[in-house]
């Protein structure tokens, strides 16, 4: 049941992402540009950039678009300096929320983030109030039909933590430590194992159960946060109730 619950949460998140793909592209380009500016334009020497490229490819961004963003950042042509700030808080029902932002105006950003929390019964907390509930890790998703034995052998040898079947759909997910993510992705590609999506994410150590009404309110808050131009990523420990899943 734990696996099914986890897969339900992943599907829920990805359905929401698909509905906002245009906005996601804008944020991915910003991350690519800043990562290249801060660590250089060579992915093999810049783990943050490599993770950003893998995430962009996982969202079907073209190589040309990625390359342009990287060159703009590496060449110092981005528009001004950006501060990276993570806000922490709780939504309705005690759901823990991390909000990663990239901004050129901190006062504007914190006001907008606080408003989104307050509007839907949540509250913005202090630094460290919920971060301890999350661990940064890589997740690599495979559609049904992949050679599971080969997948497991290659992934674990490259430094993955686990290979797990998600729910009853036949999908597989590889989990990796943050630092091993790029090496595992490279090894899978070298072995001819094509994945559906790969990303570095913040994974909750515990999940907050919600009833349907609470889930609806929390989702509205997440939607509002993700619609903010300065917000890059929103992570929660919400466990979405079964009624929200399609039959």
Curated annotation (Swiss-Prot):
- Which UniProt keywords are present, listed alphabetically? Cytoplasm, DNA-binding, Transcription, Transcription regulation
Transferase as a keyword of this entry, yes or no, is: no
Question: Where located?
Answer: Cytoplasm
GO cellular component entries:
cytosol
Q: Which terms in the Gene Ontology molecular function aspect does this entry carry?
A: DNA binding
Renumbered to this chain, the signal peptide range is: none
Q: One Pfam family, short name please?
A: Transcrip_reg
The SS bond pairs are none
Q: Which InterPro entries match?
A: Integrase-like_N, TACO1_YebC-like_2nd/3rd_dom, TACO1_YebC_N, Transcrip_reg_TACO1-like, Transcrip_reg_TACO1-like_dom3, YebC-like
Instruction: Report whether Oxidoreductase shows up as a keyword of the record.
Output: no
GO term, biological process aspect, one: regulation of DNA-templated transcription
Q: Which HAMAP family match?
A: Transcrip_reg_TACO1 (MF_00693)
State the family it belongs to: Belongs to the TACO1 family.
Protein name as catalogued: Probable transcriptional regulatory protein ABO_0750
Q: Which organism is it from?
A: Alcanivorax borkumensis (strain ATCC 700651 / DSM 11573 / NCIMB 13689 / SK2)
């Amino acid at each position: 049941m734990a696996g099914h619950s986890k897969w339900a949460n992943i599907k829920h998140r990805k359905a929401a992402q698909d509905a906002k793909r245009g906005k996601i592209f804008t944020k991915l380009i910003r991350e690519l540009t800043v990562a290249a500016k801060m660590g250089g334009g060579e992915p093999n020497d810049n783990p943050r950039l490599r993770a950003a490229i893998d995430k962009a490819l996982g969202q079907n961004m073209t190589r040309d678009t990625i390359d342009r963003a990287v060159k703009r950042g590496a060449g110092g042509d981005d528009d001004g300096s950006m501060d990276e700030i993570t806000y922490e808080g709780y939504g309705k029902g005690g759901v823990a929320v991390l909000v990663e932002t990239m901004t050129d105006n901190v006062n504007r950003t914190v006001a907008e983030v606080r408003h989104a929390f307050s509007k839907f019964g949540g509250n913005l907390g202090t630094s460290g109030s919920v971060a301890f509930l999350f661990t940064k890790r890589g997740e690599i998703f495979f559609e049904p039909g992949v050679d599971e034995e080969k997948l497991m052998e290659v992934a674990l040898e490259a430094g993955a933590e686990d290979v797990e079947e998600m729910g009853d759909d036949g999908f597989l997910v590889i989990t990796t430590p943050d630092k091993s993510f790029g090496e595992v992705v490279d090894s899978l590609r070298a072995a001819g194992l094509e994945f559906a999506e790969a990303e570095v994410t913040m994974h909750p150590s515990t999940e907050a159960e919600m009833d349907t009404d609470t889930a609806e309110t929390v989702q509205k808050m997440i939607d509002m946060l993700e619609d903010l131009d300065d917000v890059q990523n929103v992570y929660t420990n919400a466990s979405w109730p079964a009624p929200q899943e399609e039959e």
